[in-house]
Regions:
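Cofactor-binding active-site loop characterized by glycine-rich and histidine/acidic residues
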Residues: 25, 42-164, 284, 288-299
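Short amphipathic alpha-helical segments, especially helix-boundary/capping motifs
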Residues: 9, 27-33, 99-104, 133-135, ...
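Glycine-rich ThDP/TPP pyrophosphate-binding loop and its adjacent helix/strand module
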Residues: 110-265, 271-281, 285-290, 298
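Arginine residue identity/basic-tract feature
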Residues: 15-16, 30-31, 85, 93, ...
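Generic structural signal of hydrophobic/aromatic residues within well-ordered alpha-helices
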Residues: 1-4, 33, 77-81, 85-92, ...
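Residue-level signal for pocket-adjacent positions within structured domains
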Residues: 3, 9-12, 39, 84-87, ...
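N-terminal amphipathic, basic-rich helices that act as targeting or association modules
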Residues: 1-83, 205-209, 214-224, 230, ...
């Protein structure tokens, strides 16, 4: 069987594939991420969970003309690999390497610099309104997780978008977990939506979005078909996608908190490797924390 990923260096290459080829590509992309992150470290679980969604988005939408905004950026590894950075991916988060998050000066596909959560809806909405004002024929997509969407800034973006005619699609990547399991009333509501037991009116329709879903986020054929259909619908739209964080690596699916960013691990077994801390420089946050404690002790 011919390896597909090795022949993809741009989204144009991706869009030359048939829909029937996409599941094979998803398996290869997931394996590639696992093999690189096993030795180089990084945010594993989130990127494994959106492999199919990433492929479907770049397959259906005319990126980079159509603008795609990832919230936080933990899940952007597949996006980077498919948009011309496969050969550099081993330098991810390394000195003089590529960024671990979307970065505007790194690629035209990285439409917005991320790192902090809950900014994607406002950013994509601003781009959509700007395109409207300039008369540009562009589509705009924000991908946000179920933990990030519970933040105030996300609700501000939804609230604003709901009174516009902006051509905006918000995709909820619902895996019921951020770095830790999601909590709160919105999480309970989304759980009930997935079960079909919600008693309340649809919260997103109440904000003037057309709501679609839930959709299986690992069914490439269904995802691609739904995204293609939504391209023809004007105005604010909301697609609810159900995914599994850590998909494709048994341990990462089982312990989603630990495998959010597990450090080095065995790519075949998934077992986390013990660290030799003697050769590892301290992390910035640890230096900062210890410095604060030293200052507090002296004053």
């Amino acid at each position: 069987m011919k390896n597909l990923l090795s022949h993809i260096n741009s989204t144009e290459d991706l869009r030359r594939l048939s829909v029937e080829d996409l599941p094979q590509l998803a398996n290869e992309l997931r394996r590639f991420i696992i093999e690189v992150i096993a030795s180089k470290e990084g945010h594993l679980g989130a990127s494994l969970g959106v492999v199919e969604l990433t492929i479907a988005l770049h397959y259906v939408y005319n990126t980079p003309k159509d603008l795609l905004v990832w919230d936080v950026g933990h899940q952007a590894y597949g996006h980077k690999i498919l948009t011309g950075r496969k050969s550099e991916f081993h330098t991810n988060r390394q000195f003089k390497g590529i960024s671990g998050f979307p970065k505007r000066d790194e690629s035209e596909y990285d439409t917005f610099g991320t790192g902090h959560s809950s900014t994607s809806i406002s950013a994509a909405l601003g781009m959509a309104i700007a395109s409207q004002l300039k008369g540009e024929d562009r589509l705009h997509v924000a991908v946000i997780g179920d933990a990030s969407i519970a933040s105030g800034m996300a609700f501000e973006g939804l609230n604003h978008a709901g009174v516009t005619t902006a051509n905006l699609l918000v995709i909820l990547n619902d895996n019921a977990i951020g770095i830790d399991p999601s909590v709160g009333a919105l999480k309970q509501y989304l759980t009930n939506v997935k079960k079909g037991t919600q008693k309340q009116d649809n919260i997103f329709e109440a904000l003037n979005f057309e709501y679609f879903g839930p959709v299986d986020g690992h069914d490439l054929k269904a995802l691609s078909s739904e995204l293609k259909r939504l391209k023809s619908i004007d105005g604010p739209k909301f697609l609810h996608v159900i995914t599994t964080k850590g998909k494709g690596l048994r341990q990462a699916e089982k312990d989603q908190v630990k495998y959010h960013a597990p450090g080095k691990f065995d790519a075949k077994t998934g077992d986390i490797l013990s660290k030799n801390n003697d050769d590892i420089p301290p992390k910035y946050q640890d230096v900062f924390g210890h410095t604060l404690l030293d200052l507090a002790n002296s004053n």
